[in-house]
């Protein structure tokens, strides 16, 4: 039973790690895009400078929004995948459902931690 718990836990950790790297990559890309747009803005000067700054900020905001959507989607897929894997081992009789459920205290701590991460933006 512990083998399955540990295996599912490792799977979750792997997905979370991948999500964080994806989010970090999108954020870095947004910063570089902003830098490029700002560079063009400083070279063109004049009235276009303000427009370029606005475009750079909007580009960064949109990239961050996409990043958040990707993170949310991947988390949903990961959760469903692990849930289905748990269902399979329970349905086939390899493990009892009670053996897979974490103790109530652990579950409450996990939910509280997830709530805090959501408030802080996952940082």
Swiss-Prot record:
Pfam families: Synuclein (PF01387). One of its GO terms (cellular component) is spindle. The modification Phosphoserine is found at residues 67, 72, 120. Residues 93-123 are annotated as: Disordered. It is found in: Cytoplasm, Perinuclear region; Cytoplasm, Cytoskeleton, Microtubule organizing center, Centrosome; Cytoplasm, Cytoskeleton, Spindle. InterPro entries: Synuclein, Synuclein_gamma. GO terms for biological process: adult locomotory behavior; aggressive behavior; cellular response to hydrostatic pressure; chemical synaptic transmission; peripheral nervous system development; protein secretion; regulation of cellular response to stress; regulation of dopamine secretion. Its main location: cytoplasm. Residues 20-67 are annotated as: 4 X 11 AA tandem repeats of [EGSA]-K-T-K-[EQ]-[GQ]-V-X(4). Belongs to the synuclein family. May be a centrosome-associated protein. Interacts with MYOC; affects its secretion and its aggregation. Plays a role in neurofilament network integrity. May be involved in modulating axonal architecture during development and in the adult. In vitro, increases the susceptibility of neurofilament-H to calcium-dependent proteases. May also function in modulating the keratin network in skin. Activates the MAPK and Elk-1 signal transduction pathway. This is Gamma-synuclein. It comes from Rattus norvegicus. The gene is Sncg.
């Amino acid at each position: 039973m512990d083998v399955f718990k540990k295996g599912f836990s490792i799977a979750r950790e792997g997905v979370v790690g991948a999500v964080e790297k994806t989010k970090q990559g999108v954020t870095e890309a947004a910063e570089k895009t902003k830098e490029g747009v700002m560079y063009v803005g400083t070279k063109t000067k004049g009235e276009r400078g303000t427009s370029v700054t606005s475009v750079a900020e909007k580009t960064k905001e949109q990239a961050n929004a996409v990043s958040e959507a990707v993170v949310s989607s991947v988390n949903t897929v990961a959760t469903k995948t692990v849930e289905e894997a748990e269902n399979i081992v329970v349905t086939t009789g390899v493990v009892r459902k009670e053996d897979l459920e974490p103790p109530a205290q652990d579950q409450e701590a996990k939910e509280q931690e997830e709530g805090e991460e959501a408030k802080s933006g996952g940082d």
